[in-house]
Amino acid sequence: VFSGKIHKMKLNLALAQINTKLGDVEANLAKHLDYIKQAKSEKTDLLVFPELSLTGYVLQDLVASAAHKPVDDDPIFKHLLNASKDIDLVVGFVDEDSRHRFFIASAYLSGGKTIHVHHKVYLPTYGLFDEGRFFAWGDRVRAFDTRFGRMGMLICEDFWHASPPYLLWLDGADIMIFSSASPGRGLNDKEKLESARWVERVTKAYASMFTSFVAHSNRVGYEDGLHFWGGATVFDPNGEEIAHGPYNEEAITYSQLDLNQLRRTRARLPLLRDERTNLTVAELQRILQK
């Protein structure tokens, strides 16, 4: 757990929207290291990769062989942990617990250490999606401390539900990092895919309602008939868009977060101060007892 004080009020954030090779973790690692090198040359503090960025998405029977642990002696993570001595990283991978359950996971790496791991808590198993057949459900939503302040991570379907971002907000997260492997759906006569419009609307809304920074990194490319659209975004605590990546192509989207904006916004709009958490808990208990 990070215990040092925050030493920067500006955070240079980069979002990497990459294509991945399904099941080829070593090839995907090489791409990560290349993007890390690019981001370092731009003085980036934190580089965020998409959901399952080390493995690809439609893994199915490749899940077990693609799993890795975010520890020093792991053949993949040792390189990423070493890279994190110079730049903080969020990477997507398949995690495995001591009883051989497999999770869709994001790891926050900093200073050569794993600071936090989030296991995806909502696994879509409908329509195009089949995650519940192959993965275990995460059971925690926790914020964590970094050298830039307190953050939280969610993965795709997690933020299609209102409760995980709300829990992160109450747990002290001022910067929310969302990562996705979001396939395109709802193409019509408008410029944007409906899935892209929906994600951008909801991330903007979370930033506004929770007076927090919200960043979203989504992968690109095609995999097993699915098309991933990219379109990275960053919103400030006023809900204003401060960065937007291109659609349908690999890119790094750079932004600078002025962390003083948290104070300015919350002094004017004290939604966090006035949040009645005890009321929420009491009403949830009543509803659950029905």
Predicted segments, located by residue:
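CN hydrolase (nitrilase-like) catalytic-core segments centered on the catalytic cysteine
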Residues: 72-90, 156, 160-252
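Cys-nucleophile CN-hydrolase/nitrilase-fold catalytic domain and related Cys-dependent amidase chemistry
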Residues: 25, 34-121, 182-205, 209-212
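Short beta-strand scaffold segments in enzyme catalytic cores
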Residues: 91-93, 104-108, 142, 232-234, ...
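Active-site catalytic loop in hydrolytic enzyme cores
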Residues: 70-75, 97-201, 268-271
